[in-house]
Amino acid sequence: MNEKYLPIKIFEKRKEYDDRKTEAGGSPDRDYSWVLHGEPLKQHMQLLTQSLSTMKERCAERKSEGKVLPVVMKTTLHAEALAKTHRKKLVDVLESDGHENVIGVYGDRQILSLVENNAILDKITDVINKEDNASVISAITDMELYEPFIERTESGCGEYRVRLLNYNDYDRNQLVKILFEQHCRQHNIKLNTATRFTSDMYIYRVTIDSADEMNFLEDFEGLYAAEETKPLALTLDALEFDEASMVRVPDPEENYPLAGVLDTGIAGISYLKPWKEAKEHTNYPVEYQNNAHGTFVAGIMEYGDELNSYKVYSTKGIRLFNAVVYPDERKEAIYPEDLVDNIREAVKRNPQVKVWNLSLGIKEECELDEFSEFGMALDNIQDENNVLIVKSAGNCANFMKGLPKSRISKSGDSVRALVVGSVAGEKELYDYAEPNTPSPFTRIGPGPANIIKPDLVFYGGNAGVDDLGNLVKHGVRSFGL
């Protein structure tokens, strides 16, 4: 969902020296050049008072319409009042009725807070009407009713992914889910799926067939955002197919580590069949599977050293748990919500597997100021099941256009996951990267809030463009189908 409209939970201390203070002495309010005084302050006080009066009117309208959820107010901060100290003062004002009203923030300038009744608006008005509070007053640009972000399809109809407001209260979050599902039934909005991404975030997928249905969706009081949803698309970037010189089989006397492969499925080829666990998990029948990608990934895990002339593996083999969580795209579409559901089910039903590989993901790059829903879902799955997911950082083709590398993909911003990027093992004609440096196609960090991602790198191939502008790639080798 568009970063402009997504809330984040990141409060980060300004790294550089705050040079917005003036050199003159005086009261703390006068230490900041953006703090208003005199007539400009009075005019701004009137503006904010009017905004709060409008909020009261909107609250009354909502109540008369029979709405049962509290109103959410959006408070916009001055562009030069983003320091932690100023935000803290503003939060104190928004919670001056003794309740934890702040539920999140929008981008880096807007705070979302609950308005249960007029009492909190009256308390805020009291603060706004005192010139002694010039710094707090000046830090506020506007206060208005929160309006959900709606990204319509070209026709207005189609499938939408819907996210509800998070009220930071279990009972209220349960209520908003019940009300939304009732709202959909009452207005004939087809509710396709409801997927739990985290303990307090569900993503719905609905079908909108008319303008009236779209209007009813927008009118729901607990709506946070709605946008067009599209199926995922899987790509095989910088990969090459090969065969090992001989089939290896497990030594019955050896105790091999076990790893789960969350992918399209591992085919029963002679090289991998001896290493596959007898038990497996699948969300799709055989006729809806295409095992090419999963087989390739499993081949790297099992025969990576031999196929790619490396000598870096510390194990003599690895037991492979096959988890088919992704279908053949030619036969069945899959949406991000489906993939999250499938991963959660596979991990939960197989507690014997503590390390999982996930080389699937989302093409879009992560944001700098908010974690992706997919990444948060992976964190939640790992927390609840006490497992580690090893996740690819993702690839991009920007190097072919002379553009900078994309940041790690959404889902690669999982804090709990071990995210792995790619480095080149060797350099051939037309290859861009020197040995042991980042591959041209690998995505890079940082992640949201400047977290370090990827966590590790491993050999993943090289690539470049020849004299005719054609892609030349020398990827990692594994088994093809």
Language-model segments: residues:
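Catalytic cores of nucleotide-enabled group-transfer and carboxylate-activating enzymes in metabolic
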Residues: 213-226, 296-299, 303-307, 313, ...
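Flexible, small-residue-rich helix->loop connector segments that border functional cores
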Residues: 262-269, 298-317, 344-349
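Autoinhibitory propeptides
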Residues: 1-61, 80-250
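Extracellular S/T/G-rich loop segment that most often corresponds to the catalytic His/Ser-adjacent loop
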Residues: 255-257, 263-267, 271, 409-481
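Short helix-loop-beta-strand segments that form the rim/entrance of peptidase-like active sites
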Residues: 301, 308-331, 354-356
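Acidic-leg catalytic submotif of subtilisin-like serine proteases
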Residues: 244-285, 295, 300, 454-456, ...
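Active-site-proximal beta-strand/loop segments in catalytic clefts of secreted hydrolases
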Residues: 262-265, 324-326, 358-362, 392-395, ...
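Substrate-binding/access-modulating region of protease and related hydrolase catalytic domains
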Residues: 175, 326-416
